[in-house]
A protein has these predicted regions:
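C-terminal structured domain segments
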Residues: 334-342
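Beta-rich carbohydrate-recognition and catalytic domains
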Residues: 1-72, 76-137, 145-203, 207-262, ...
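Donor nucleotide-activated moiety binding/catalytic core segment of transferases
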Residues: 259-267, 330-333
Length: 407
């Protein structure tokens, strides 16, 4: 096969993957439907990102730049299209952001021509003046928020080496990077979030609260370990262009022998419904094989986004089947979801909800539900009783109820 024929065969194979129709799994749990195929893998990335198509310079048609994974994607519906800002990880371990677009949200995702060029973070003097920039070694896990101030915000983790531990090449620090855009192509980088501790899991609430920007935070002592950090926090910010956490309180706590014993964090920004705010979060616990990441849900009051009104016990979504396998095993993580039908800022009960999650830090998937089903799940699923005895009592109550039904 000559060089041009090899390219033609490569393009045909790639198009077959991009055009593959996705279908729901035959059986589910009634809460949501998972789909048969991942929506994005490393192989979905454009061939032009990976191959040099010059026969002179690349006679063997080798991949010159290899892509390792597509994961942890922010999501939004824009101009009738379903857009993901994907964390793409190269073989060199560096992550970057790229937009992938779908006409229906469940398949036919295609990346835009080029990755996002994210500007460096401005450095501020004590007087608040910009005096330079600081380039992070790695950036990843963007949460997208279309804010009522008219901007699209992307909040993400900015990782740098911890120079206070010069001899430890694995020592790192995490800060919250902040950028905003009008078109997802040109981004304005704002100064990183200023906080008293490390912040790698921060989400912007879509509305002003008491005239201020509101953040869901995750205070932690180290890059990985939460230490004294108690869970999902809440902070109000006066000026997003000079964002600083001055006061912070925990609104969703970690607890012993639960799915969020080690740490927990907000996923995407919550969805506003007439019943309250729907929240999707991740919880982490330790087990024999390492850290297990799962997704869980909770709801807060419509007039008080910090007041929890419902929280089902246990996990909402976990890795299953082939989802267990990947770079970091036994992980489900989500930082993007989309409610299809929004009226006056509120997702209607009949609205489809697309939940975008990554499995094992390797590939992207979608699960679909509706606002009505997710609200029902949150409001009517038993809470965690925190003791085996309570769990057994809950099951026996349901058994007794079902015995009295003619089904």
């Amino acid at each position: 096969m000559n060089f041009q024929n090899k390219i033609a065969a490569l393009r045909a194979h790639h198009e077959e993957l991009l055009n593959r129709i996705n279908v729901p799994n035959a059986w589910g749990n009634g809460i949501y439907e998972k789909y048969v195929y991942p929506i994005l893998t490393a192989e979905h990335t454009p061939l032009e990102w990976r191959y040099d198509f010059s026969e002179k310079d690349n006679p063997y048609l080798m991949q010159r730049i290899m892509i390792n994974a597509t994961l942890n994607s922010g999501a939004m519906k824009w101009n009738g299209k379903y857009l993901l800002v994907v964390r793409v990880e190269g073989a060199d371990r560096k992550s970057f952001f790229a937009v992938a677009e779908s006409p229906n949200g469940v398949d036919n995702f295609r990346f835009w021509d080029e990755p996002i060029t994210m500007p460096e973070a401005p450095l501020l003097s004590p007087e608040g003046e910009i005096f330079g920039t600081d380039d992070a070694t790695n950036i990843y896990d963007m949460r997208l928020t279309v804010h009522e101030d008219g901007w699209i915000y992307g909040l993400f983790c900015a990782e740098r080496h911890d120079d206070s531990q010069a001899d430890d090449l694995s020592a790192a620090t995490a800060t919250c990077g902040i950028a905003r855009t009008k078109d997802l192509k040109t981004w304005e980088r704002l100064p990183d979030l200023k906080a008293k501790c490390q912040q790698r899991n921060v989400v912007l609430h879509p509305e002003f609260v008491d005239g201020k920007y509101a953040l869901y935070t995750r205070p932690q002592d180290g890059f990985i370990e939460t230490g004294s950090g108690g869970g999902i926090g809440w902070a109000l910010i006066d000026d997003i262009t000079h964002a600083e956490v001055k006061e912070e309180r925990i609104i969703n706590s970690r607890r012993y022998h639960t799915i969020m014993e080690v740490k927990n964090g907000e996923g995407p920004h919550p969805i506003k419904t007439r019943h309250g705010w729907l929240h999707l979060a991740h919880g982490v616990r330790g087990c024999a094989s390492g850290l297990r990441y799962v997704l869980y849900m909770y709801m807060t009051a419509l007039d008080a986004p910090t007041r929890v009104i419902a929280q089902p016990g246990g996990y909402f979504l976990v890795p299953e089947g082939k989802e267990y396998i990947g770079d970091v095993m036994n992980v489900a993580f989500a930082n993007g979801w989309i409610a299809d039908d929004i009226v006056d800022g509120v997702a209607i009960d009949e609205s489809r909800v697309l939940i975008y999650y990554a499995s094992s830090d390797t590939r992207m998937h979608v699960a679909t539900s509706t606002v009505a089903r997710l609200v029902d799940y949150c409001m009517n699923t038993p809470e965690d009783g925190f003791y085996t005895r309570k769990s057994v009592e809950t099951i026996k109550t349901l058994v007794a109820k079902n015995k009295g039904l003619k089904v």
